[in-house]
UniProtKB/Swiss-Prot annotation:
Expressed ubiquitously in seedlings. It comes from Arabidopsis thaliana. Keywords: Cytoplasm, DNA damage, DNA recombination, DNA repair, Ethylene signaling pathway, Nucleus, Stress response, Transcription, Transcription regulation. Belongs to the IES6 family. Transmembrane segments: none annotated. Proposed core component of the chromatin remodeling INO80 complex which is involved in transcriptional regulation, DNA replication and probably DNA repair. Together with REF6/EIN6, involved in the epigenetic chromatin-dependent regulatory mechanism that monitors the expression of the essential multifunctional plant stress regulator EIN2 via H3K27me3 repressive histone demethylation and histone variant H2A.Z eviction, thus modulating responses to ethylene (ET), especially during embryogenesis. The INO80 complex controls ethylene-induced H2A.Z eviction dynamics. Component of the chromatin remodeling INO80 complex; specifically part of a complex module associated with the helicase ATP-binding and the helicase C-terminal domain of INO80. Interacts with ARP5. One of its GO terms (biological process) is epigenetic regulation of gene expression. SMART domains: YL1_C (SM00993). Disruption phenotype: Differential expression of several genes. Compromised ethylene-induced H2A.Z eviction dynamics. Plants missing both EEN and REF6/EIN6 (e.g. ref6-1 een-2 and ein6-1 een-1), are insensitive to ethylene (ET) and exhibit reduced levels of EIN2 associated with a shift of the chromatin landscape to a repressive state at its locus (e.g. H3K27me3 and H2A.Z). This is Protein EIN6 ENHANCER. GO terms for cellular component: cytoplasm; Ino80 complex; nucleus.
Length: 124
């Protein structure tokens, strides 16, 4: 079949005009593949942090002052934001359903929840 095409004097273009250009023809290959984003672990290993003095600020030991905003009040039972506090038990709660649960707790359980939050009252 190839011999017949050669003898027929048919000229076939190397690239047909109706075909779209491929992406690799439009955009040349990137100049350097060595410029890539580095992960934090790679940066930390490259910096040799143990050799640096401890007062020098780095990624690892940046010291910041305490926050000026008050900490969020979270529900002691569910962990959601708690706009309410039970005056009898001093536990924080998020909604009415949790309030019923708070009221049904024994005094030992209430004391355990308060000790988790470091708000337990110690009587001497």
């Amino acid at each position: 079949m190839e011999r017949e095409l050669m003898e027929a004097d048919i000229v076939v273009a190397s690239r047909l005009s109706f075909k779209k250009k491929q992406a690799y023809e439009k955009y040349p290959k990137a100049q350097s593949s060595s410029r890539r984003w580095k992960h934090l672990k790679q940066i930390l290993q490259a910096e040799n942090f143990p050799d640096l003095p401890p007062d020098l600020p780095t990624y690892v030991n940046i010291e910041s002052p305490p926050s000026t905003q008050p900490c969020k009040r979270l529900c002691d039972i569910t962990g959601y934001e708690a706009p309410y506090v039970d005056p009898r038990t001093n536990l924080r709660y998020a909604n009415a359903h949790v309030f019923q649960t708070v009221r049904s707790l024994s005094s030992d359980q209430v004391h355990q929840y308060l000790s988790i939050r470091n708000a337990a009252v110690v009587l001497k």
